[in-house]
């Protein structure tokens, strides 16, 4: 009797779990009724493209800073990972990164609208890597320099000069793959958020690496000062 009750309870739990997973998936993807969060987001992306991209980019940029600080164990002077850089990164994502991406990717899509040949797709990838990416990366590095405390043109220029080619090398590896995927599988109005997500992971990696190097250099300076 006890074994039978246990089996029935197990089946009931499995059924409830399956139903819950189904409902969560339906809410996320929209299911057949198109009422999920993804469907709602895509509708907002079509009806209010720039606003939706600004909110998406701002959220991802702020989250990127918090996540990179957590991975690198870079705590603020108050002992937590939410530093003054987080709201600055959020503002950068909303008012610089998103509008710039909206403009540049929009131009790229208009130039190649209706052109689906292999040659056109290759040209679009080349234009993205040789025109769009350099502009976005230069603006990104200038913004990061200012957020980090650069106040003179020389400081900003030095930051861009030092970081431009390393960032471009990462872009030249990831951008063709991301754009080829977008060309094949995604509607054009979802491209900018998709690239924002790709940029989120790349930016988190670069930001984490930079923080770790800075903390390591700081520890070396502190260790040297103690031995003197």
Swiss-Prot record:
<dbReference type="GO" id="GO:0030428">
    <property type="term" value="C:cell septum"/>
</dbReference>
<comment type="similarity">
    <text>Belongs to the peroxisomal membrane protein PXMP2/4 family.</text>
</comment>
<comment type="function">
    <text>Woronin sorting complex protein involved in both Woronin bodies (WB) formation and inherence. Localizes to large peroxisome membranes where it self-assembles into detergent-resistant oligomers that envelop hex-1 assemblies, producing asymmetrical nascent WBs. These structures are then delivered to the cell cortex, which permits partitioning of the nascent WB and WB inheritance.</text>
</comment>
<dbReference type="GO" id="GO:0005778">
    <property type="term" value="C:peroxisomal membrane"/>
</dbReference>
<comment type="subunit">
    <text>Self-assembles into detergent-resistant oligomers and forms a complex with hexA assemblies.</text>
</comment>
<protein>
    <recommendedName>
        <fullName>Woronin body membrane protein wscA</fullName>
    </recommendedName>
</protein>
<keyword id="KW-0472">Membrane</keyword>
<keyword id="KW-0812">Transmembrane</keyword>
<feature type="transmembrane region" description="Helical">
    <location>
        <begin position="130"/>
        <end position="150"/>
    </location>
</feature>
<dbReference type="Pfam" id="PF04117">
    <property type="entry name" value="Mpv17_PMP22"/>
</dbReference>
<dbReference type="InterPro" id="IPR007248">
    <property type="entry name" value="Mpv17_PMP22"/>
</dbReference>
<feature type="transmembrane region" description="Helical">
    <location>
        <begin position="89"/>
        <end position="109"/>
    </location>
</feature>
<keyword id="KW-1133">Transmembrane helix</keyword>
<keyword id="KW-0576">Peroxisome</keyword>
<dbReference type="GO" id="GO:0005737">
    <property type="term" value="C:cytoplasm"/>
</dbReference>
<dbReference type="GO" id="GO:0140266">
    <property type="term" value="C:Woronin body"/>
</dbReference>
<feature type="transmembrane region" description="Helical">
    <location>
        <begin position="162"/>
        <end position="182"/>
    </location>
</feature>
<feature type="transmembrane region" description="Helical">
    <location>
        <begin position="185"/>
        <end position="205"/>
    </location>
</feature>
